Structure formats: structure tokens, C-alpha cells
């Protein structure tokens, strides 16, 4: 799906003109799909660390997923935060060790990058760790305690 979207954007949208017009470093394309409940993939984001177009990011959100429910507002927020560099905290990935994932599971972590609540309001928390990963806060002590990887903003 990524290549189809990336090709469409390259062929039809002048991303450089958008960056210049809005004095932006990056452009985020948010795709919203009106999907059925059956056979719908989970939402995903493809951003800076995983995209060959380092100044373009893609977010895909499927209105219905998981077989049973419509995507709640917290899902939108979670996916948008990916576009700014926040990693998922619910599985092991580069910079997120298993021990930290286990800790989040055992403590009932309410970080929006670990859990997305259902319902009309967002009750998940935007934490200092999230602020660090999206580039608006300092590296919190817990990142060093758990050996979490650097944010995209520290890595550049």
C-alpha cells in the first residue's frame, strides 16, 4: 500500500511547494479509509525512520477495524503522534526493549502510545516520554532507566 500512496503523492502533489508555502520541514499525508468491519487492517503510520522520503510521512486510518468497532478519537491521536516521531510502546521495536513493554503491561500504563481507549473522549495520557519522542520535551529519566532509544530529534 505504501508504494501506491507514495507514487500517487509524487505524481499528483507538489510536496516541495507545500513545504515552502507553509515554511514546513515535513509534510504528513493522512489517509482515511471508510472500511467495512471485516478484514480491515489496523491503522499504521510510516514516518521518518522507516520512509525513503525523509520529508514526507504517511498515516493510514481505517474507520472500522478490529472486527468490531469504529476507530475512536484516541486512535487518530495515536497515529498522528507517530507522524511526529512517537513510537509504539506496546511491542518490542528498535529502541523499545521487551522489559519496558512488560513493565507497561504489568503497571496498567495509560500512555497513549501504549493503549488506545475506546469511547468518544481521549482518556489515554500524553506523557513526558511522548513529549520527548515528538521533539517538544527533554529526555525523561525513565528513557535512560529502561535504555530506550533516542528520539528522531536527538538522532539528527
Which role does the model predict for each range below?
Residues 2-93:
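Active-site-proximal segment of zinc-dependent metalloprotease catalytic domains
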Amino acid at each position: 500500500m505504501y508504494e501506491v500512496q507514495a507514487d500517487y503523492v509524487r505524481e499528483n502533489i507538489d510536496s516541495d511547494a507545500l513545504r515552502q508555502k507553509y515554511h514546513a520541514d515535513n509534510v504528513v499525508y493522512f489517509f482515511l479509509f471508510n472500511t467495512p468491519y471485516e478484514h480491515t487492517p489496523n491503522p499504521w503510520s510510516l514516518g521518518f525512520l522507516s520512509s525513503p522520503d525523509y520529508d514526507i510521512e504517511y498515516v493510514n486510518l481505517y474507520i472500522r477495524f478490529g472486527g468490531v468497532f469504529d476507530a475512536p478519537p484516541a486512535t487518530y491521536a495515536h497515529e498522528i503522534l507517530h507522524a511526529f516521531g512517537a513510537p509504539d510502546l506496546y511491542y518490542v521495536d528498535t529502541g523499545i526493549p521487551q522489559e519496558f513493554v512488560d513493565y507497561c503491561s504489568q503497571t496498567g500504563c495509560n500512555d497513549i502510545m501504549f493503549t488506545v481507549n475506546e469511547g468518544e473522549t481521549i482518556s489515554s495520557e500524553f506523557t513526558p516520554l511522548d513529549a520527548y519522542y515528538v521533539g517538544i520535551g527533554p529526555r525523561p529519566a525513565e528513557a535512560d532507566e529502561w535504555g530506550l532509544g533516542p528520539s528522531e530529534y536527538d538522532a539528527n
